Each structure stands twice: as C-alpha cells, then as structure tokens.
Amino acid sequence: MSSTIMVILSAFVAYLLLMIVIGVVYMKKTSSSEDYFLGGRGLNAWVAALSAQASDMSGWLLMGLPGAIYSLGTGQIWIAVGLFIGTVLNWVCISHRLRKYTIAANNSLTIPAFLENRFQDKKRILLLLSSIVIVIFFLVYTASALAAGGKLFNTVFGIDYHIALAIGAAVILCYTFMGGFMAVCVTDFVQGTLMLIGLLIVPLVAYLTLSGSLSDLLTQSGAPGGAAAFLNPFENGERPYTFVEIFSQLAWGLGYCGMPHILTRFMAVKSEKELKKSSMIAIVWDILSLTAACFIGIIGRAYLLPTVLGENGASSSESVFIEMINKLFSSHLGLPFIGGIFLCGILAAIMSTADSQLLVTASAASEDLYHQFIKKDADSKEILAVARFTVIVVSVLAFVIAWNPNSSIMGLVSNAWAGLGAAFGPTVVMSLFWRRTNLAGAVAGIVSGGLTVIVWDYIPLAAGQTLGSYTGLYSLAVGFAVSLAMIIIFSLATKAPSKEITDVFDKVAGK
C-alpha cells in the first residue's frame, strides 16, 4: 500500500473513530425510547437543519447526481431543481404544522403513531400498514447507502467491494445501535458540515486548475451532443428533453413530505423559534450543496481528462467526485490528508442517510409493531432493546440487498424515494391540512400510493417493459397523484371524522 493511500486511510480511520465516540457518548444519555427515537424533542436549529438535509441527500448527492450529469449533461439538473422546491415547501409548509400536531396527537413519537392518533384508528390498521411500508422501502434505501459506501472504499483503497461493504455497514451499525437519535443527529450535523465544505471547495479548485477552456475540454471528452448540448439543460445528448422527462425529474420534489427520516427532525425540534431558524439554515444548505453537486458533474468531465469515466475499464461515472479528489489533492496539490478529509465527506453523506433510515426502521419495528401488537405492556427499556436488535437485523438485510457490486445508487434511491413519497406524502399533507380527511381516506392513500409505485416500476407489460420504462414517467408522480385522488374519494364517500378528531385539528390549525 502506497504512502499516499496510507495517509488517506489515516484520515478515514480518524473520522470513523470520531463517529463511534459520539455513539458511545450518547449511549450513556439514552435511557428511554423517546430519547432513542426523538432525542427528547431537544434538537436545536443547527443540528435539526443540517441533520435533516444530510440524512436526506445521502451518497446520491455526492455520487448519484454528479454521475448522472457527468454522463448525460446538465439536463439532469431538473432533479436538483425539483428537490430544492420540495425542500422549501417541506420546511415552510409541513414542519411547523407537523411538530404541533404530533404533540397534540398524544405526543406521537413516529409517523405511523401520528397517523394512528390523528385518525383515532382503534383497529390499528394505519399503524400496521405504515410500519410495513417503512420497513420494506427503507430496506432498499439503506441498501443504496451501503452500496455507495462499498463503491467508495473500493475506488479509493482498491478493497474488494464486499469487504468494503462490510466495513461501512459495521461502523454505521455501531453508532446507531449505541446512541440512537441524538447520536445520529449530532453525527449528521458533523457530516452535513463536512459534505458542504467538500462540495464547495473541490469543484472550485478543480476549475481553477483546468488546462484549457471548459467548453473545449468538454468537447474533447466526447460529451454527449458536444459541449453546447451538454451545457444546455433542455438537451438530452443530441435531442431536446421532452416534457415528460423534465416533469419526471421535477417530480422528485414531491417525495419530501413522505420521508419519515426527514419528518422526524421536524418533530424533534425543541421549539417553534428554533424551527424557524432551522428552515432558513436548511434552505441555504440545500441550494449551495445541490448547485455544487451539479458543478462537480460538469467540471469533473473536463478535469479528469484524458480519463473518461465509464469507458475503457475506468471507474463508473458515479465515482466522479472521488476521482476528482484523488487527482486534485494527491497528484496536483500533494495534500493527500486533506483529500482524505474530503473523501470522508462522501462517506459522511452515505452514513448520514443510512443511520437515519436504520433508526426510522427500528422505531417502526419496535415502537409501532412490537409495542403495539406483540407486547403492549413492554416498558421503555424493553422497547429500546428491541429497537437496537432491529438495527442489527435491518443492517444485515440491507447488506444482502447491496451485495451486487453493479447496483446503481441512483436506481436504488429512485425506487425507495418513490415508494415512500407516494405512500406517505399525500397522506401526511392531507392529514395536516384537510379537515375532512378520515381513516378510510388515509388507508386508501397509503395502499394505493405504495402499490402504484410497485406496479409502475416492477410489473412488466406483455413486451417485457414496465409502465415506467414504457412511458418514461417517474413512478412517484403517478403514485402521488393516485394516492391523493384515493384519499379525497374515500374520505368523501365514507363517514366524516368525529367531532373529537376535528376539534384537535381545529386546535392545531389555530381556529
């Protein structure tokens, strides 16, 4: 192993040890299930904002999005635009109402529990349904994060993908298992800061060291359709983007209001005042990080010449940020330790999402399934033990799903994001803002949204294509629309909610 690799490795080891230390510290402060799942509702503005955004973006931000732009051009920025709009609406419209409502609805600790309490579901249908949806789709989502970690270690250190996968999974498992929500949020705060610094500095320094004009270098790299088409957000290689393609990318923003690992941050902020600060911090972080990630894909195409990723045995395009850091800090600047720190930023993106997803899945399994259906008299410490056991089980299952080294990070994230967004997004929005929404509507929304995504993405037509591949329309857009329609239809076709339910709604709405 070369001295450069050893220096980079030392940065990784130091970073991973810091994450584990944070887990140990918060393990001593975690004594109940409310501490483990929501940190006692004690998050401050900075931790809430950066942990929410870091857990949201994942390795997709530093690998998936830059890789898509590297391969296909700036037409892929519409995903970033959709996500930014979704982030703003989520923080401005959803966060305050959700925090107030979860407290009013029997101090709900999880999204499934909130939905059950919101509609006073005595038969517990919502709790069971939503917990199952979370476990299924978060398994896929967690697998995408582990796959990104495996590719990172494989590319940087030449470690076998499967060994790299095991290392990443083990570290994430350690601090999530020990410290719960506060450990996850504090590590995500550190990781969100590191991600943003890396995203801003690397493309800027790489651009300043280019050996020619960006346009000429893009042409030399064989950019699809030439430099002009590559830099045109309305072009897809040698042809214009269709309305369906742009709409499908913008539709990613619909997913935010259905993401339990993001929504729980809103529930955990300690005051309305802190939540307002969090909103501004999160929105600024989001626009800076998404813009920088797009520039990584563009500048990376020119900077890495003569290498063209994805061709002649080179790394895949999703490794563009990794390759830029290696070339910039190890070859050009001779600062491998600094490069190692920025590579830790990619690891941070991966870990910040995986830990949050593990925690939400653990809460669904222990609080919503075990406590409510299997052992109703379980005390807080027993629920905590079940949650920690769930973290282990889910980590192992996600590890198995991510076993294939050819797994697409973008593909795995896309499927999980669509499933969660379509199942929960319309239901959460309507439960917060439409007084007439009832239990039947909520159940219909979750079932129809989740099933639509599964049918759209996985059930082949006669020709072997799925509806998604045939139409080019993102399943989240279809699932969200179907779910919303079913909520309205079933709510209006069945009995109106009781006065007891609407009184709580009116109280939260300030009527």
PLM regions: where:
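Membrane-embedded helix-loop-helix hairpins and adjacent transmembrane boundary segments
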Residues: 1-511
